[in-house]
A protein has these predicted regions:
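Catalytic-core regions of hydrolytic enzymes
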Residues: 37-51, 57-162
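Active-site-adjacent substrate-binding region
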Residues: 159-184
Length: 245
């Protein structure tokens, strides 16, 4: 909504105990002022649209771990569950690759990582799936790195369009001062193997202590989920395949 304050501005107001550190963080890396325009709801019937949401990692695979011990798998699941609720409230059919702290590999698997990813991509590749969204968190040796980033399979035009829509919504709603570009990739297993338009959404950097505070806050997780939801529904509304009917 055009009259709404930037999500990060609202977050600071709500989270007084983190006010100083977050204010410094935002002044360094984000606009921290102005109005953010969010995309409008399509208002269309979405009952026949299937969305796969994939909270990355899980079980014995924690993913990235912050210096304070925050595990990526837990943040991924929290954001993914918030995103699930948004889609279901709007009438979408949601398929989750996991809803608990687990992986998808069999207990006796000799190649647990490959088996886990294979099962995830099998869910993403069913014929009725409109899009697949894999939720992750980033990490980098430079602890000042921050902000969202979205990856897509380099040979997928639909994946590129989806990535652009999702990252655009994130950058707009988070008022990112120095937005990253969408990133083509030809190596990531789920991007390469999934037959539905698929993106990996890196919501932020667990290597950045200030951003870790944001990523572990429930209100901010809800805001991230809402931005991703807007990006996906905008993509579906404009998709020539007509998934949003």
């Amino acid at each position: 909504v055009g009259s709404e304050m930037c999500i990060r501005d609202r977050y600071i107001i709500k989270k007084n105990k983190y006010c100083l550190i977050l204010a410094l963080f935002i002044l360094s890396f984000y606009l921290g002022r102005g109005v953010c325009a969010l995309a409008k709801n399509t208002g269309k019937n979405t009952n026949s649209t299937v969305i796969v949401i994939d909270p990355g990692h899980g079980g014995s695979d924690p993913g990235k771990i912050s210096t304070s011990g925050v595990m990526e798998k837990d943040v991924n699941l929290s954001i993914a569950m918030a995103l699930k609720q948004l889609f279901e409230n709007r009438g979408f059919t949601v398929v989750m690759t996991r809803t608990t702290d687990c992986d998808l590999a069999p207990d006796n698997s000799k190649h647990p990582k490959t088996d886990d990813l294979t099962k995830r991509t099998a869910l993403m590749s069913k014929s009725n799936v409109a899009v697949s969204i894999s939720i992750h968190q980033n990490s980098f040796e430079d602890s000042s790195s921050c902000g969202p980033q979205v990856f897509y399979y380099e040979a997928s035009d639909a994946g590129k369009e989806l990535a652009s829509s999702v990252l655009g919504a994130l950058n707009t709603s988070l008022c990112v001062a120095n937005p990253r570009s969408i990133k083509p990739n030809k190596e990531y297993f789920i991007l390469k193997k999934s037959t539905s338009p698929t993106v990996i959404v890196e919501c932020g950097f667990l290597s950045n202590p200030a951003e870790t505070l944001l990523l572990t806050d429930k209100n901010y997780q809800d805001d991230l989920a809402h931005a991703i939801y807007i990006g996906v529904t905008d993509y579906l509304a404009q998709s020539p395949s007509g998934h949003l009917q």
